[in-house]
Amino acid sequence: MKTVKRPGVLAATTLIAAFLLQPSLGATAQAAAPPAKKEGYSESFRGSQRDNVEFQKIAPFKVFDNLYYVGPGFVSVWLVPTPEGAILIDTAQEPYVDHVMASIQKSGFDLKAIKYIILTHGHLDHFGGAAKIKEASGARVAALEEDWRMIESAGTTPSRGNAPPPRVPKRDMVLKEGDTLSLGGETLKFYKHPGHTPGSLSIEFTVYDNGQPHKAFVFGGPGPRGGVSGGEQFLASMNRVAQIPGIEVAVNVHSWLTSYPYPNGGILERAQKLAQRKPGDPNPFVDAASWRQWVKMAQDGAAQNLQDEKQKAAK
């Protein structure tokens, strides 16, 4: 994919311990009901507090020099700033889209600086805010062909309770396996990893921690969708992911992965550790061992899932 040069992004203000992730993220969350005793903090956002809108509105935080978390608690939205503009990975859904846009601005960036919105897959919690953020920013929206079809179909299908269909973004860019996108010195490499959806998109890029580079990876669909076909696709995708060398940072699409929970803490547990980090301490998001452990867990789980799906289909 052709390298794109765009106008600059506003300089980021340092997000010091204003978000103080202990025991909760932000004043609204502190006033909310505590998570169930047996839940971890990240897990609570997809468990007991899944429908608690105010609890979900966590404060944004900086993870690396060039990576910010700007989503609600249950589903990730990642901002990748560069000197020539910013890239947004996923958008969350209503009623959280205004919160996402406010979080981008609180992190020191103008919405107009967003040049690209990359959608990891065609589920509403990941693409639901894309149309509104595109309208506010002028960004181009990108996804794989198979999930563009899912997104466009959702725009003509009534929502739950016969509510109107969600707003869907205009198709700007159709990504393919092996494509790259370059902006302001940052290059994203794209992979097609179906299984969660037919066109789940993964992303490889470099993050910097006080100038030190680390290989980061977004696995766009971390769980099988069901059925033999989905199970076969997911297992094949996990086996391909396992062959990608040198991944140190998992940029997960949910704070807590329900199918195969991420070992040694989800996004928000790691964010708590990051808020308490002292000079010279390692960044808790740089954790190649946990990535390898999770990949093996997901491979084993995918193999078992496929066996189970085949047994169901044979009945």
Predicted region positions:
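Active-site HxH/HxHxD metal-binding segment of metal-dependent hydrolases
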Residues: 67, 95-98, 105-180, 270, ...
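Metallo-beta-lactamase
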Residues: 33-36, 43-47, 56-57, 62-64, 86, 93-95, 171, 180-182, ...
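Conserved beta-strand hairpin/beta-sheet module of binuclear metal-dependent hydrolase folds
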Residues: 53-107, 111, 202-223
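C-terminal regulatory/interaction regions
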Residues: 288-315
